[in-house]
Amino acid sequence: MIAGLVLVVLLTKYLQRVFLHPLSKFPGPSIAAVSHLWEFWHDWVKNGTFLEGVADLHRSYKSPVVRIAPNHLHVNDVEVYHQVFKVNTNFYKAPYFYEAFGFATSIATITNPHRHKPLRTTVAPMFTGTAVDGMSDEMYDMVRKATDLLAARSTGTGNKFNVMQFLRCITTDVSCNLIFGETLDLVSNGYHSDRFLGNLDTFVENVWIMVHAPWIAQFALMLPNSLTDKIVPGYAYFREQCISWIDKVRARRAKGITLMRNGRPTLFDVLMDDNPDKNYKVPSKSELIDQAFLFAIAGTDTTSMATTFAVFHILNNPAVRERLCEELRGASAIIRDQYNYREVRKLPYLSAVIKEALRMSSPFPGRLPRVVPPEGMKLDNKFVPGGTIISISSRCIMDDPKIYPEPEKFLPERWMGENAKSMDRNMIAFGKGSRSCLGTNLAYLKMYTMLSTMFCRWDLRLVSPTDHKLRYLDHALIEMKSQVVVEILADHWTT
């Protein structure tokens, strides 16, 4: 009898979700109407293939809106994106998703806008255009040091290196210095000299377990680190590293040292001071650890990944490579002789290459769930009630041929034509609105400096991937599956 009652309840729930639910008017697979198994299948079982799966749904159903879970719609419409992702939006981040990653109170994952605003306005001055311009000499010094060390290892018969590993050493050291006032010395000692990046990779590889089985993750975080690491690999070490950094900042501040040698405070010096004007109070240590976790991830992988995409596509397109190298070598006075970031970022073809690389990489490529406000909204001329979760993936927008013709091709020239302004409006690599990426200016500084130095200095050849295809997975961040390896054929700064 109990089994029969359970069957009736399940059947009733099935019929309600498939036929009577407010979202039943939207197309999608039946399994998505009754459970979260469609998302789980692509995220976990098929390992980060959500983007491929959702793109197939939009094509198969010929609809800009598809149902991917009982109360969750995926939207592929750039105008809806601008409606949702705007300043003072009332489409708030969905707690089930953002609070699951293990750093729920960070500036990127906190869902309450009233808690987010004081935090953002307090740290935002560190990331303004003027503030970032002031970091350009330090950024160039780090890139120059990295390229000098790599060139010194050349035997004269060619020097091959993994682009992503090389760039991550730079971005990690730069970001850690900005955030905490110290580096891991990866540029000097090499990619494998510290466990930090390996544990970050392990955490990202397993991140979906925290979203789809949050109770497992919550249980794991209550255990000793050795056991936590078996359930959520990489997380415990990464958090330990963040604690160590914070403790060092506190110890330094206890000695009265609140500014670095460059005369600027670190990000954590700012976070460790109350700011009554911004209604900001120093949070608990646990919340500070969440901030460290987020900023360390964001500063390490996003720009190194986008720049790796750029290097691959530049070398995979001889005409692009030749035009870029010609522009950069003609500007060696502002790159090699005396680096001038303000002038470098005015270089038109380099700027176009960077925009196209960002379009094709989208460091946060997948769904960014938001909660529909109480008054509801219309999608595809159908009413969607408040409380519904809607997602829009930047990768789908960036691959839309109506916005970017021939989106599969790397075409920097598209950013130099008459449609550049409209395309700029739809460039969403860093998000839009109140919750857009705080580090956009810093990301551009890193990309401009790394690419201008590498291609002004070196003649490079693409060694792998040999099939000239770049493969990646959606693990919230892009996880690179292709190893981009290049060879230095000539060094124009040592001849």
Curated annotation (Swiss-Prot):
Positions annotated to bind heme: 437
Pathway annotation: Secondary metabolite biosynthesis
Keywords, in A-Z order: Glycoprotein, Heme, Iron, Membrane, Metal-binding, Monooxygenase, Oxidoreductase, Transmembrane, Transmembrane helix
EC annotation from Swiss-Prot or TrEMBL: 1.-.-.-
Co-factor requirement: heme
Subcellular location: Membrane
Regions crossing the membrane: 1-21
Outcome of gene disruption: Abolishes the formation of aculene A and accumulates dauca-4,7-diene.
CDD domains: CYP58-like (cd11062)
PANTHER family, per the entry: CYTOCHROME P450, CYTOCHROME P450 12A4, MITOCHONDRIAL-RELATED
Entry similarity comment: Belongs to the cytochrome P450 family.
Name under which the protein is recorded: Cytochrome P450 monooxygenase aneF
Species for this entry: Aspergillus aculeatus (strain ATCC 16872 / CBS 172.66 / WB 5094)
Origin organism lineage: Eukaryota, Fungi, Dikarya, Ascomycota, Pezizomycotina
